[in-house]
């Protein structure tokens, strides 16, 4: 839906047309409970007028003193029975209402999380979609239930209103219709405020995300050291307050408008009600109606006033919530990663990868990130990818792993175009350690087992991969068990150093029985000895498989069978270390720069190579 600032009838009708979609969603999630609540709401709506009529008869029988005591007692007991029944229905309805709220909240959250997990990486890198996700998740805990609650409340109020109007019309039809005029007129203005409120929240989704981020870094451990060291607390608090202050001003303005409109509405309704009550009292004095009738008409007026207000508020709530629900539907209808359909599964290990004239451009960017990439990788090869920042190394890996779709050219896996492959079976053949690897605030077993989720309970294999990555810190502390909570977010969590987290992430990658291993800047959090151990393990595990690693340090790249040199999205050199020193000026410059950075140039280089070669 295109967002506009002026309320138009066609927009109102469009929003209200979302109702069938909302009912369909409700029926899909909780059909049985919803129908029960509607039935209870109808019964609840009828009971007030039934109770009112019985009380009228009771008062009239007492005033006239013409009826037998037994009849009066019968009417009284009937009144009590209706009251008890009304309370029973109310409590049962509250129970189902609470149950419905819990179920619908959990199921919708699950639906949104499932949808998020089915989106492509490019969607999470798109600010527009990220804002849409922010709007949806921010209000999902109450907005969908709010619209359902409004429907139920409106059903109850509508039944009560109709029965009350019918009761009053049996006395004075013309006067009764006056009670409906003001709510109908007021409804338009309430809807206009509702739209204004929605658009305010819609526009500030980006700022909401910024304020959440500031709050996040102020309240979590990963940023604590820099916040203290650079004394950022006051700056960030002020930045947060500036954002929230503008929100408070906007919300106060809306609140002021709502309060003023409510005041005008209540005064008008009370005046009309007073006129009707005055007419009823005069009719009683004239002997046209009895005292019990006057009391019941006064209560009927009150019921009409209250429930017309309730209906109007419910319509406002439905309209306002439907604006949100439209955002939810837009998110749920986002295009997902292509269905696997009848695509070909990988039935054997990956033995060849071929990039044929592959180019890639990020959305909303004019220049290609990768340009005409042609390269082949084969089983038994360990390949290093080097190049300056922004040269396209990580984009190459994201295309290879299927996280991005190829725009131009083809990637062939075992001779099959990657677009024709079943991506789940393909990704099952890949084990990767990304530079921004996950630190799951979960158990040690989960942190490792996520590498092969169907083997999560194979702790013997976990012991093996921990030995492979030489996670000695786990052996030296008897307190580390597979059910040990890692991180500090939850109770009894154990925090790890950056290098220890990386070893756990490496164990997760090696837990998978893959045929293509990828390491993205594996030395970023490791000391030289741990770095040497990491590459020893990598070269050992990737034997007879395909191994790829990105590195800024040529001392590790020298050990690869081949080195791919990238610059400005292009491959500018492929070969061994010695070959590239002769044929690739950029590689030679990188090698000279690395040696220059070592104060003991020649000795340092020899020491590093000796360390890597054992």
From Swiss-Prot:
Its main location: membrane. Residues 34-320 form the ABC transmembrane type-1 domain. PROSITE patterns: ABC_TM1F, ABC_TRANSPORTER_1, ABC_TRANSPORTER_2. Keywords: ATP-binding, Bacteriocin transport, Cell membrane, Membrane, Nucleotide-binding, Protein transport, Transmembrane, Transmembrane helix, Transport. The keyword Transport applies. One of its GO terms (cellular component) is plasma membrane. It is a multi-pass membrane protein. ATP binds at residues 387-394. Residues 353-593 form the ABC transporter domain. Belongs to the ABC transporter superfamily. This is Subtilin transport ATP-binding protein SpaT.
